[in-house]
Amino acid sequence: MKLRPLHDRVVIRRSEEESKTAGGIVLPGSAAEKPNRGEVVAVGTGRVLDNGEVRALAVKVGDKVVFGPYSGSNTVKVDGEDLLVMAENEILAVVEG
């Protein structure tokens, strides 16, 4: 199944994060914080402005992004994988390089 977000929505696959502390302690899944980085896997057509124009999104498929800890509260399971759906304005930055 393929997910096509609408308007200014973005679909993100969370990055896998190490579940070890700096001291080498392995954290159980419930104690580890969810990663706030991911890869954009789908983008909508753009934000519809008040005058009816559509503004293209600043992110594109394949971008590595950083988002806040409470962003992307909409999780969707697609082909056994949990994906986040969030508005573009919930993305804080694009990781370059």
Curated annotation (Swiss-Prot):
Any Gene Ontology biological process: chaperone cofactor-dependent protein refolding
PROSITE patterns registered for this protein in UniProt: CHAPERONINS_CPN10
Keywords for the protein's UniProt record, in alphabetical order: Chaperone, Cytoplasm
Glycosyltransferase is among the record's keywords: no
UniProt superkingdom: Bacteria
Record-level Gene Ontology MF annotations: ATP binding; metal ion binding; protein folding chaperone; protein-folding chaperone binding; unfolded protein binding
Compartments in which it is found: Cytoplasm
GO CC annotation: cytoplasm
Xref: InterPro entries: Chaperonin_GroES, Chaperonin_GroES_sf, Chaprnonin_Cpn10_CS, GroES-like_sf
Gene3D superfamilies from the UniProt entry: GroES chaperonin
Principal location listed in the UniProt entry: cytoplasm
Record bears the keyword Manganese: no
Subunit structure as annotated in this protein's UniProt entry: Heptamer of 7 subunits arranged in a ring. Interacts with the chaperonin GroEL.
Family named by the database record: Belongs to the GroES chaperonin family.
Stated role: Together with the chaperonin GroEL, plays an essential role in assisting protein folding. The GroEL-GroES system forms a nano-cage that allows encapsulation of the non-native substrate proteins and provides a physical environment optimized to promote and accelerate protein folding. GroES binds to the apical surface of the GroEL ring, thereby capping the opening of the GroEL channel.
Protein name: Co-chaperonin GroES
Organism: Pseudomonas putida (strain ATCC 47054 / DSM 6125 / CFBP 8728 / NCIMB 11950 / KT2440)
Organismal lineage: Bacteria, Pseudomonadati, Pseudomonadota, Gammaproteobacteria, Pseudomonadales
Gene: groES
